[in-house]
A protein has these predicted regions:
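Conserved phosphotransfer cores of two-component systems
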Residues: 70-75
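Conserved phosphotransfer microenvironments
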Residues: 53-69
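A short, hydrophobic beta-strand element within the central beta-sheet of small alpha/beta folds
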Residues: 76-85
Length: 121
């Protein structure tokens, strides 16, 4: 299958991972789950628009530092997801360079629209 859009996800939330996989399959988006920033380079392809999705609640590495590293080293958009909005986390994420922040539920409900928006940027 030829994909035009790829999500590279850092999460250890099994329920969210299953739901995200289901939604990506429904719309034909490529999805990879990785455990470290060093794996991103293997997932990038010049022919495919890629974004990174960082779980702000359930990841062992510091997602804010990870965002800065990804933006500096790879220059791809970084989205943050969390279980429930927190003004403090949202402000910190914005300062760190996250492109967009979603609750997991909101992202799953609107993933198609988000991908269309990012693809048109």
């Amino acid at each position: 299958m030829n994909y035009e859009f790829k999500i590279i996800a850092f999460t250890n939330d099994p329920q969210f991972s299953i739901s995200l996989t289901r939604e990506c399959n429904k719309y034909g988006f490529s999805l990879s789950f990785i455990d470290s920033e060093s794996e991103i380079i293997n997932e990038l392809d010049d022919k495919i628009i890629s974004v990174t999705l960082l779980d702000l609640n359930n990841f062992q590495e510091d997602p804010f530092q990870l965002c800065e590293t990804i933006k500096t080293d790879h220059g791809i958009p970084v989205f943050g997801v969390l279980n429930k909005f927190s003004k403090h986390v949202q402000e910190r994420a914005k300062k760190t360079g996250f492109d967009l922040i979603f609750t997991k539920k909101m992202l799953l409900r609107s993933i198609r629209e988000v991908v269309i928006h990012v693809s048109n940027e």
